[in-house]
Structure formats: C-alpha cells, structure tokens
C-alpha cells in the first residue's frame, strides 16, 4: 500500500475570487494547540495583539504568547500580523525578540505567536524603579539596542515603532527589541510608505512633515529619543499633537532650513506648519553634564536631514561608548525581582481569553 494522500489545505484568495490549494511541499507542518500552554498572566498589549506570560506544559519553559488581534478581519489573518510573523521567522539575533513558533486556538481565526519571554520592559521599569539607571547602565542598554538595529538594517528591515515600551530586558540584562507589527522590509530604490507610523514622541521630523520615503534613519531618530529619555529619566519630546511635537523639536534643535536640510520645504506637510524662529540648538543646555562625545552622538542622531543622520554602525563606533563611565556588562545590570510580571490571574489553559488588566510590575 502506498502512503496516504496528504490532507488538502485550501486558502481563500483575497485579490481574486475563489480558493487555491497549498502544495504539500510548501507546508511547514501542523501547528501546536494553544491548549498546550498554561496561562500565567496578561502582561501587555502590542501594536496588533494581547501578550500573555505562559508555561509550555511539554517543556516547562516560560514564554510570552502574543494573541493575534482579528477585530476587523473577515478574510483571515491581518496583513500586519503576517508581516510580523514573516519578518520574525527570519530574524535571529540576541537583541531581537525570538519568535519560537505559531500556535492555534479552537477557531481558525485564533492564532498565537510563541515568543521568548523577557522579565520586564523598560517603560515599566522607568516608571517604577526607585533609582534611575546610571550612565554606565544606559550605555549598556543603548549599545544592545544599536546592535539589534544594525542587524535589522543590514537585513533591510525598518522597525518603525521604536520606543522604551518596545524594549524588553531579561533578568540577565539582555535587551531585546520587540513588537514588529509596524516593521517593513525595504528595497532599493525605497518605495513609498505611510508616514503615520512611530509613536508620536519618537517620530522623526520628516514623518511629521509627511514624507513617504522612509529609511532606517527614522529608527535612528527614535534611538536618540530613547537615549535622551534614559539619561534624563523622562521623555525628551512628549508632544500632545503633531503640531506640538514639531514645535518641541524646533524648541530643542532650532528651526530647520534648506541649508541644513535640503528639500525640507518641499515635504508634503511643510507648508501647513508655521515654525517659530528659533536659531539655537539647546541639547547642551538640556544635558549640561553630558560629555562632548555624548553630545556629539546625540546631535548626530538628531540631524534634521535623514541622509546625514547617524547609522547604527556609526553609533556603535562612537567614542561615547569608549569613555568613562564605560558601559557595564549586561550580566551586571541590576535585577528587579519586585517589578517582574508575576502570576496575576488564575492559572488556566489558553483556550479562552482572560479579561484581566495588564499586570503592572
């Protein structure tokens, strides 16, 4: 007797009417059921889904389970989630969150991403830790973010939503960039993309002025905001609207001009802003204690012209990270046992969704 015929998998085609069959050689194998995981607590919400802390009942490993949100979808998995899954499956770096596998619930539209678990996120730590990070610890964190970004950018991926709440840290001090719901692969030449990305406080000026040509430089602006936030112990540019955000940038860096940012006046939304006349760069006034190397790095990250903005590789070579206080080793980063996500809901299987609120550390 020959081998049995493989079960047919038929998928609905979104762009054309009808269905198509997935050939057996293109299948990755059956996904495990989410019932094989024990839910411990809900720990947050990413761009496109709820995140749980859970235990793999087969291996006892603690993982993060991200439930893919299907709120507005009628024809299957949201394209944003497909992008995130596709990107994460090909990314392997110590400073990028790991997608271990995809598991399914009771219904076809119930999908979970099994991610490597990190004990805390930087946003919660900044809100709750009694003593702010030292400069040596800030350098340790930012170096790890830069290494992860260098890997992403070398693989032609823009994260597009870097912020402290998307930076996770393990109890070994390893920092990992997470939440790739807005990430995009890009090519050369760069294709147009929507400017409505990146959380407002971390949004580069070219995005605020409506550019559709997005490059890795938008991630680097966000790194500058993160570095400044970690050093100052508060957000650098906490705008309440896009107009306010632009004004805060001008107050900090001075008014942009064609001399320092060629093509700036031709950006789609440039004519809609009435920019205050402010000729001074106030970074040194904002960080009077920061070394010349630190200010130089920050200025390179906050260049108005995206083409002149520092790359992740440039930053990794910065003398700021080679002067005292030197970056501490990740293993020597402080631990925060009282800020970890502990069991906040009854332990159950993940067949049903909890209504508990985010368990703040």
From Swiss-Prot:
It comes from Bos taurus. Heterodimer with CCNQ, the interaction is required for kinase activity. Interacts with ETS2. Interacts with PRK2. The keyword Nucleotide-binding applies. The modification Phosphothreonine is found at residue 194. PANTHER family: CELL DIVISION PROTEIN KINASE (PTHR24056), CYCLIN-DEPENDENT KINASE 10 (PTHR24056:SF508). The gene is CDK10. Cyclin-dependent kinase that phosphorylates the transcription factor ETS2 (in vitro) and positively controls its proteasomal degradation (in cells). Involved in the regulation of actin cytoskeleton organization through the phosphorylation of actin dynamics regulators such as PKN2. Is a negative regulator of ciliogenesis through phosphorylation of PKN2 and promotion of RhoA signaling. It catalyses: L-seryl-[protein] + ATP = O-phospho-L-seryl-[protein] + ADP + H(+); L-threonyl-[protein] + ATP = O-phospho-L-threonyl-[protein] + ADP + H(+). Keywords: ATP-binding, Cell projection, Cilium biogenesis/degradation, Cytoplasm, Cytoskeleton, Kinase, Nucleotide-binding, Phosphoprotein, Serine/threonine-protein kinase, Transferase. The lineage of its organism: Eukaryota, Metazoa, Chordata, Craniata, Vertebrata. It comes from the Eukaryota. It holds the Pfam family Pkinase. Residues 332-361 are annotated as: Disordered. SUPFAM superfamilies: Protein kinase-like (PK-like) (SSF56112). ATP binds at residues 43-51, 66. GO terms for cellular component: ciliary basal body; cytoplasm; nucleus. This is Cyclin-dependent kinase 10. The keyword Phosphoprotein applies. One of its GO terms (molecular function) is cyclin-dependent protein serine/threonine kinase activity. Belongs to the protein kinase superfamily. CMGC Ser/Thr protein kinase family. CDC2/CDKX subfamily. The active site is at 161 (proton acceptor).
């Amino acid at each position: 007797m020959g081998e049995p015929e493989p079960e047919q998998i038929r998928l609905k085609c979104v762009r054309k009417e009808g269905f198509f069959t997935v050939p057996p050689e293109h299948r990755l194998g059956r996904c495990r059921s989410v019932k094989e995981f024990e839910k411990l607590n809900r720990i947050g919400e990413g761009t496109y889904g709820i995140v749980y802390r859970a235990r793999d009942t087969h291996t006892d490993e603690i993982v993060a389970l991200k439930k893919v949100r299907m709120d507005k979808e009628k024809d299957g998995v949201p394209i944003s989630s497909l992008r995130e899954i596709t990107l994460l499956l090909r990314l392997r770096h110590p400073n990028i969150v790991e997608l271990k596998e995809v598991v399914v619930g009771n219904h076809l539209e119930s999908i979970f991403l099994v991610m490597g678990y990190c004990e805390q996120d930087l946003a919660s730590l900044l809100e709750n830790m009694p003593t702010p990070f030292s400069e040596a610890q800030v350098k340790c964190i930012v170096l790890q973010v830069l290494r992860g970004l260098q890997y992403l950018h070398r693989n032609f991926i823009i994260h597009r939503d870097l912020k402290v709440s998307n930076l996770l840290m393990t109890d070994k001090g390893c920092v990992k960039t997470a939440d790739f719901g807005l990430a995009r692969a890009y090519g050369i030449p760069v294709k147009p993309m929507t400017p409505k990305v990146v959380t407002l406080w971390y949004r580069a000026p070219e995005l605020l002025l409506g550019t559709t040509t997005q490059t890795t430089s938008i991630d680097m602006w966000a790194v500058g905001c993160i570095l400044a936030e970690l050093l100052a112990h508060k957000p650098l540019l906490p705008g309440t609207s896009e107009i306010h955000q632009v004004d805060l940038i001008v107050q900090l860096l001075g008014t942009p001009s064609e001399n320092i940012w060629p093509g700036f006046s031709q950006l789609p939304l440039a004519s809609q802003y009435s920019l205050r006349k402010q000729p001074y760069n106030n970074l040194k006034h904002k960080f009077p204690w920061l070394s010349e190397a630190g200010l130089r790095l920050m200025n390179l990250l906050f260049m108005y012209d995206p083409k002149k903005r520092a790359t992740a590789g440039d930053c990794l070579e910065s003398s700021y990270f080679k002067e005292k206080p030197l970056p501490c080793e990740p293993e020597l980063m402080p631990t925060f046992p009282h800020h970890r996500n502990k069991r906040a809901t009854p332990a159950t299987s993940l067949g049903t969704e909890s209504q508990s609120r985010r368990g703040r550390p």
